[in-house]
Amino acid sequence: MDEKLIIKKFIIRKLYRKRMWLHKHTNIHNLPKGLSNELRVSREIKSAIDELLKEQILLSKPTHYGLEISLNPKKVKEIEELVN
């Protein structure tokens, strides 16, 4: 499987499992935690997160302490396809 796809699925599953929808969010720096060291240090993480934001699967909320990320409830079907 492609590294970027593995990272995307991991991030989506993590947020889905913790029910991070719309107003419940987490810091962008917490997303790669739990990945293997190989994938965590790769440059694919940043591009995978950027792609998910562009596809509007992830929503971003800028705060004074950093960027917060949550799942988009309007994209539930696409998110569930990635999770399963």
Where do the language-model regions lie?
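Short alpha-helical segments that sit at the start of domains
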Residues: 1-23, 83
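Short acidic, hydrophobic short linear motifs in intrinsically disordered regions
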Residues: 21-35
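Short beta-strand-to-loop capping motifs
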Residues: 37, 71-73
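A short, conserved structural fragment
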Residues: 53-63
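Minor-groove-contacting beta-hairpin "wing" of winged helix-turn-helix DNA-binding domains
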Residues: 65-71
